[in-house]
Amino acid sequence: MGRLIFVSFGLLVVFLSLSGTAADCLSGWSSYEGHCYKPFNELKNWADAENFCTQQHAGGHLVSFQSSEEADFVVKLAFETFGHSIFWMGLSNVWNQCNWQWSNAAMLRYKAWAEESYCVYFKSTNNKWRSRSCRMMANFVCEFQV
């Protein structure tokens, strides 16, 4: 009886320690601060990339950065996965011509502009944002909250 309680307690500890970690992410996705991320080496325009992300998981969108630490994590992940490339993120003015917003409707709090235009991408070699026509093709990073 004591052994059963000990084993049950041990399993409970393991389960609780995995909560909110990569165990909550799909296979091939990486976890950071309660979110799962995956860079995709597929060239898509911004709208097609956003649509693809929404189909990957409930609540999925192109990545949105809420802090420099989160951005550093994703930039490093993208570089380690594919090397030098550019990646769409969820920031655009597609829906409101003058108001930038993340594709998941989060407020824009953290900024790292290099220049302005339509849809925003980042280079996997640094954390500098650039904009370009949303019709251009780029790789992308999807994100969902666990």
UniProtKB/Swiss-Prot annotation:
Subcellular location: Secreted
InterPro entries cross-referenced by the UniProt entry: C-type_lectin-like, C-type_lectin-like/link_sf, C-type_lectin/snaclec_domain, C-type_lectin_CS, CTDL_fold
Domain of life: Eukaryota
GO MF terms held by the record: metal ion binding; toxin activity
PROSITE patterns in UniProt: C_TYPE_LECTIN_1, C_TYPE_LECTIN_2
Leader sequence residues: 1-23
Keyword set, alphabetical order: Blood coagulation cascade inhibiting toxin, Calcium, Disulfide bond, Hemostasis impairing toxin, Metal-binding, Secreted, Signal, Toxin
GO cellular component: extracellular region
Keyword flag Metal-binding: yes
Tissue spec: Expressed by the venom gland.
Entry keyword Kinase: no
Disulphide connectivity of cysteines: C25-C36, C53-C142, C119-C134
Pfam families: Lectin_C
Domain C-type lectin: 32-143
Family: Belongs to the snaclec family.
Other known facts: Calcium is required for ligand binding.
Complex formation: Heterodimer of subunits A and B2; disulfide-linked.
Function: Anticoagulant protein which binds to the gamma-carboxyglutamic acid-domain regions of factors IX (F9) and factor X (F10) in the presence of calcium with a 1 to 1 stoichiometry.
Name of this chain's protein: Snaclec coagulation factor IX/factor X-binding protein subunit B2
Species of origin: Trimeresurus stejnegeri
Lineage, broadest ranks: Eukaryota, Metazoa, Chordata, Craniata, Vertebrata
